Regions:
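Eukaryotic alpha-helical solenoid repeat scaffolds
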Residues: 1-38, 44, 183-301
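Residue at a conserved register position within TPR or TPR-like alpha-solenoid repeats
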Residues: 52-55, 89, 123, 157, ...
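Canonical positions in the second alpha-helix
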Residues: 71, 104-105, 138-139, 172-173, ...
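TPR alpha-solenoid repeat register
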Residues: 47, 80-82, 114-115, 149, ...
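Short coil turns that delineate tetratricopeptide repeat
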Residues: 75-76, 110, 144, 177-179, ...
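Structural motif corresponding to the intra-repeat A-B loop/turn of tetratricopeptide repeats
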Residues: 57-58, 92-93, 126, 160, ...
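Structural register within alpha-helical repeat arrays
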Residues: 50-51, 85, 119, 153, ...
Length: 301
């Protein structure tokens, strides 16, 4: 592969923020050996950062150190380079040393979000859940709009079977990114796991509303549910059954159960039948259709 094609390929990965480490390392090594990064001007330093991360990913720490040294020499007090140095340390140093390195940086600059998140990541890998939660809560008090931080907190709570707390963290995610149906689906499934079925069915229906192409009755009957819409209809079906089995079911969020439960169950059944009756290019989902048809045909209660 020529130097020019390697440069173009690496630039494409940077533009897409892709982390194809093997290919980046292979092309980046060619550029580094031929001194091509010097021709990139200011983009050359971004290239070195890209190659550093790829080298760490593929275990070529010698090349990572070579790139890091060039960056440190050029930007001796850069917070961005400090973060790269920390990531490099994580590959070989004990967690205690890495945590101290991050703590020293945060003591000098408590607003360094990247370093703070790396520290949280290391703490989680050590299994110190209490410390991770405390650190993450402090981080989110400072950087409330960090969606990844709230998702991390929700995941930690869920891993400890604290689904109510996980759902609370996800409500902040929905406030920050209300247009993302995947986060709404995650919140719906978390509500279902915490047995708040009225809230869960409401959120599953929200996912359907967000992912349907149109609200018209005609399209609703003719369109084929795909992707997370199918998953949301499964959620509606499951919630309808659980609510029907217990008429006195209480919702921790004080969400009222839907009055038209039977109609929702019938609609979910019809939508799932359509999804699993698809053919042609969309037919992959049709695998196991007989099992699905038998399941959805079961009585509501």
């Amino acid at each position: 592969m020529s130097l020019q094609s390697s440069l173009e390929r690496l630039a494409s990965y940077r533009a897409k923020n892709a982390r194809a480490s093997q290919d980046i390392f292979r092309n980046g090594l060619l550029v580094l050996q031929k001194g091509g990064f010097k021709k990139l001007g200011d983009d050359g330093w971004t290239f070195l950062e890209q190659l550093t991360l790829a080298s760490i990913d593929v275990g070529r720490l010698d090349k990572a150190d070579q790139c890091l040294q060039l960056l440190v020499d050029k930007f001796p007090n850069s917070p961005r380079v400090d973060c790269l140095v920390g990531i490099r340390m994580e590959a070989t140093e004990p967690p205690e040393i890495v945590l101290k390195y991050y703590a020293d940086i945060l003591e000098a600059d408590s607003a360094n979000a990247a370093i703070w998140k790396r520290r949280i990541s290391v703490l989680r890998r050590t299994g110190k859940v209490d410390k991770v939660v405390n650190e993450l809560v402090q981080f989110l008090d400072t950087f409330y709009t960090d969606v990844e931080g709230w998702l991390e907190l929700a995941d930690i709570y869920a891993s400890c079977n604290q689904y109510d707390h996980s759902l609370q963290a996800l409500t902040h995610v929905l406030l920050l990114t209300p247009q993302n149906p995947f986060y709404v689906l995650q919140a719906a499934e978390t509500a279902y796991t915490s047995e708040d079925f009225p809230l869960a069915i409401k959120m599953f229906l929200t996912v359907v509303d967000m992912t349907d192409a149109d609200d018209s009755e005609q399209l609703l009957q003719e369109s084929t549910p795909l992707g997370i819409t199918v998953r949301a209809w499964f959620g509606v079906k499951l919630c309808a059954r659980r609510i029907a089995q217990n008429a006195n079911l209480k919702s921790l969020s004080n969400t009222s159960s839907p009055k038209n439960l039977e109609l929702l169950d019938e609609l979910a059944t019809e939508r799932l039948r359509v999804a699993y009756s698809s053919s042609g290019q969309k037919g992959e989902i049709a695998k196991g259709r007989q099992e699905v048809f038998a399941w959805v045909a079961a009585p509501l209660a």
